[in-house]
Amino acid sequence: MKTAGEPDRRRQRRQVRTGRFSCAWWSTSVMLFFSLPEGNCMKESLPRVKLGYKDLIHSRSVVPFTGSSEGQHFQTVLLDEERSRLLLGAKDHVYLLDPDNINKHPKKLSWPASRDRVEMCILAGKNPLTECANFIRVLHSYNRTHVYACGTGAFHPTCAFLEIKGHKEDRWLLLHSNTMESGRMKCPFDPNQPFASVLTDQYLYAGTASDFLGKDSTFTRSLGPPPHQQYIRTDISEDYWINEGKFISAHPISDTYNPDDDKIYFFFREASRDGSTTDKSVLSRVARICRNDVGGLRSLTNKWTTFLKARLVCSIPGPDGVDTHFDELQDIFLLPSRDEKNPMVYGVFTTTSSIFKGSAVCVYTMEDIRAAFNGPYAHKEGPDHRWVEYEGRIPYPRPGTCPSRTYDPHIKTTKDFPDEVISFIRLHPLMYQSVHPMTGRPIFTRINTEYRLTQIIVDRVAAEDGQYAVMFLGTDMGSVLKVVSITQENWSSEEIILEELQVFKNPSPILNMEVSSKQQQLFVGGSDGLVQVSLHRCQIYGQGCAECCLARDPYCAWDGTQCSRYIPASKRRARRQDIKHGDPSSHCWDTEDVLGRNVEEKVLYGVESNSSFLECVSKSQQALIRWFVLKPGVDHRQEIKPDERVLITDRGLLIRWLQRGDAGSYFCTSQEHRFTRTLLHVSLHILDRGQINAHQPAIRESSENPAVTEPRQRYKDYLRMLSGPARSLDEYCETMWHREKKQKQKGKWKHVQELRKSRNRRHH
């Protein structure tokens, strides 16, 4: 009999065996790290462009919310593009902003926890700054004028209705205190606890811990129109329904055109213990319940009678059937498709090991998810109580099926289910088959980086050669990765990190992200503030067609004069773009100057036996930099190879001590996607050291003479410093720093003297 999670032989390389987590996990992790298959895992690409916070400010592509302050904890964002409003849930406050201009007349509603609750929270040993406050975790549009909101309330969750009054130019928030109610099973106690909720048809579905200690994990339905306002929740008597769950996301998705068959899908991770060992592992799950589930009649009263769950697998297939797993689900994003019943499911996963650190993005189809729920059930059997495939009789109607008169006129609600259906689903909530990525492996991975992926937003972009799903991935270090995965002609995928953006002034974990495709903006919330980031900044790629084409950014194209936003409906004929291959030679006219004839020649003088540095930095971190030199009297260029005297760095070429034979023309070239161009052309002239030393007495004499003009004196001082024996770069910089400081002090003293003279003139 097969164990739950174990595949048939045909799928053995794609699925994982339950019970692999044992005391040998440490050695297994190390083995997996060194046996990772070649492919998109180990050959990870660098971000093509890396921009810091100052770079984003300079390019005007980031706008920080000026009304925020340190420790505000912006982890709840509600974007309503239809009504043009942006609500932020923070510590003790709710903000109402205009998404067109987040700093234009922002409105702030104060909603702190009561003093008694704060004192009790502190007495319970919680942190008064980061825990004992009202952190807003729930913001859902209830109708056109009201928002349902919940906060942690200093470990005493509280919910209420907020009303948005006024018009767009003069709106404000009003808290209806008479609607305040307990937020238990609607909102977490702990502000740092993962949590998921969705409000649809006036019902609130929430996955959270329902107790102070955070042990009782439950998925609950509450609110609703009268008289259907009773709680429906998961069964806590059996820990194999949800065991120490951490909820990530919840979404209403229709399975068929029959509204009675509509379901709520929610994603979470939980602790899983196999019966053969006491070790606990973390597994990611997708679960679903019917929206018309009202609980059982005699059993499972006020509890879900259609609850089913299946494992989400995100792994890299390895040799001998040993896969590298990313088991901790961090975030989920549903990318809509033409068929609203079949969105693409994007998930961010991380590893559970502290030795092997990694993150991955896997994509799933609703077809595969539904196939798992329509497949065999799992069953605990044997002395070790392992989950195995259930091969017995399945009662009618099939457990997990939504009640509908279309299927059976005798079953109108879940209270009409036979007792054997209720008993079966109570003991068999887990499906036997796991859900695997549509590509069989992650579409994007990060291994042993200083950060981990925590958030994901996906935007579908129309380009010249097709449509692309551009991913914006938030990290726990405050950066956002802009990534596109391209499928080539041979069906192999290529991951491209277009940009790495440091969106916060002070790096901190990204807590939430929302995208506005209408405004082409990304709203990013963190512990200390919120920023608005543009989805594209085409002008930073360069001033030529080739540079714009090499960027491979679906948002950008060459319009004949500059790199600008690509608009599919544009009537411009000179749109140049190649996302799939990034080959400017077939799209641009400025690709023939490989020898750099059009690059401006710079002249540089160096002194024999001194060092010289030729700076050359490519805008692209993915480009291969190569150096060439054309010596006098030689008719062809020679590539420079590093040795003990010549060093090639990421910033340029360093010649540690110059020789007479180093004179010549130096070329810095950049090669990217089989396209080569010249970035720098320097003509290096070597000055004879003996001649420089012969002029040193004259230089000293002229430098001591105050009658010598300042420009001439500074130029001679430069020559004097360059001619010094084996002067290091630090010594050179220190000398220049002292000289500039002395000149500033001299100028400042001269200015003070002039002021005193002018004052004396006034008094006399």
Swiss-Prot record:
Domain Sema: 48-535
GO cellular component, one term: extracellular space
Cysteine pairs bridged by disulfides in the record: C121-C132, C150-C159, C290-C402, C314-C362, C538-C556, C668-C733
SUPFAM superfamilies: Immunoglobulin, Plexin repeat, Sema domain
Membrane-crossing residue ranges in chain numbering: none
Positions of the Ig-like C2-type domain: 661-740
GO molecular function: chemorepellent activity; neuropilin binding; semaphorin receptor binding
Record SMART domains: PSI, Sema
BP GO terms, sorted: axon guidance; axonal fasciculation; blood vessel endothelial cell migration; cardioblast differentiation; cartilage development; cell proliferation in hindbrain; embryonic heart tube development; embryonic skeletal joint morphogenesis
Residues carrying covalently attached carbohydrate according to the record: N143, N490, N610
Signal sequence interval, chain numbering: 1-41
Subcellular location as annotated: Secreted
Region annotated Disordered, chain positions: 743-764
Protein family according to the UniProt entry: Belongs to the semaphorin family.
Function: May play a role in the guidance of several axon pathways.
Protein name, as recorded: Semaphorin-3D
Taxonomy of the source species: Eukaryota, Metazoa, Chordata, Craniata, Vertebrata
